From Swiss-Prot:
The gene is era. The lineage of its organism: Bacteria, Pseudomonadati, Thermodesulfobacteriota, Desulfuromonadia, Geobacterales. Pfam families: KH_2, MMR_HSR1. This is GTPase Era. Disulfide bonds: none annotated. Residues 15-22 are annotated as: G1. Residues 41-45 are annotated as: G2. GO terms for molecular function: GTP binding; GTPase activity; ribosomal small subunit binding; small ribosomal subunit rRNA binding. Keywords: Cell inner membrane, Cell membrane, Cytoplasm, GTP-binding, Membrane, Nucleotide-binding, Ribosome biogenesis, RNA-binding, rRNA-binding. Monomer.
Length: 297
């Protein structure tokens, strides 16, 4: 790499739930930008972490774990994870050193068959296994897919993550940086909150309200005591839809708010105050400006 060359690109971290994707990203960046938990599915949307190096910018994408989707939200999360495979320059497939390949890994390997980007196998939690066991795991996975590299790491301790970053750097194409060098991440909590509220609208109103509902989080503030204040607007196209969502004496809107609040609190691992409003935005689904404002373009 000469002084005139700059390399940049997007790198997707994929794997089954709770394999350590968020922990790895936080360790590489040297800061906690992604919620981590012992519970699977802590990450519910793609989260970008920007790693700036001399002559290089790596934009990491931490995706939801790929799993068997059951709920609408889970299907959305899996779609987000799988779609990232088609949009990046390098793919990091993260597995655990202390577990054998299972159905979830086979599902991911099947999806990788159509990937055009080079795939690096990252074997996490090497601090938990003996060297002989690690070598067996590396050989087993290498026989399942033509990985560009196989890198053992410990996301918890940071062992060998420097080598991983160097491998990624060498695989990136030439190009200018995508973000200013003082930007660490673009964390879309408000977009995830909007999706959760929208799902509750669909579930609680059933077929009474069509899918022409857009939720916009207009305010997202954290107080000194840790309480997060969220204000969101549920946009509908007709007055009759507004009445259904509000319900008799406001009971339906109250239910939507209560169920959404519980799920958001579990996601963010803190208390929240959720304030919901319903607004008639006539024919918003056909209005280019409104579509842009609501985040659909």
């Amino acid at each position: 790499m000469t002084e005139q060359q700059f390399h940049s690109g997007f790198v997707s971290i994929i794997g089954r739930p709770n394999v350590g994707k968020s922990t790895l990203l936080n360790k590489i960046l040297g800061d906690k930008i992604v919620i981590t938990s012992d519970k699977p599915q802590t990450t519910r949307n793609r989260i970008q972490g920007i790693h700036n190096l001399p002559g290089c910018q790596i934009v990491f994408i931490d995706t939801p774990g790929i799993h068997r989707a059951k709920s609408r939200l889970n299907k959305y999360m899996v779609d987000v994870a799988l779609s990232s495979i088609k949009e990046v320059d390098v793919i990091l497939f993260l597995v655990e050193a202390d577990t054998k390949p299972a159905n979830q890994e086979e599902t991911i390997l099947g999806a990788l068959a159509s990937a055009e980007a080079p795939v690096v196998l990252v074997i996490n939690k090497v601090d938990l296994v003996a060297k002989e066991s690690l070598l067996e795991k590396m050989a087993a996975y290498s026989g399942l897919y033509p990985f560009r590299e196989v890198i053992p790491v410990s996301a918890l301790t940071g062992d060998n993550t420097g080598r991983l970053v160097q491998v990624v750097r060498d695989l990136l194409p030439e190009g200018p940086p995508y973000f200013p060098d003082d930007i660490l991440t673009d964390v879309p909590e408000r977009f995830v909150v909007a999706e959760i509220v929208r799902e509750k609208v669909f579930r609680l109103t059933h077929d009474e309200v069509p899918y022409s509902v857009a939720v916009v989080v207009e305010s997202f503030k954290e107080r000194d005591d840790g309480l997060i204040l969220i204000s969101a607007v549920i946009n509908v196209e007709r007055d009759s839809q507004k009445g259904i969502i509000i319900g008799r004496k406001g009971e339906m809107l109250k239910k939507i708010g209560m169920q959404a609040r519980r799920e958001i609190e579990e996601l963010l691992d803190t208390r929240i105050f959720l304030e919901l409003f319903v607004r008639v935005s006539r024919e918003w689904s056909e209005n280019k400006q409104m579509l842009k404002e609501f985040g659909y373009e």
